[in-house]
């Protein structure tokens, strides 16, 4: 479901793609919801957008959801696997309604697609 690339390899692809769009990216990974919430709250105002793979927190991460709402920036929810083509419960994301959209099922390419989209959303905000 998730492919064979390591997180480091995926991050490398994301960095390469973002640099072509003249975007600066920051990576943060944690398996603990509180750490993710703290990171988002500690960095309010430092980011123009958030791309997040909430993993299992997709289904029950209410503190994460609240932190994303309060961040007040464009958010894209990303999943390596197609959560809509797996068990029914996997498609019930509580994050989806606070994100501008969701990209799922394209492996590491889900992240580069999200970079393209968030770049456009940021540019749209700056031009208004």
Regions of interest found by a model, annotated:
Residues 26-27, 76, 85-128:
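Short, glycine-/small-residue-rich phosphate/pyrophosphate-handling segment
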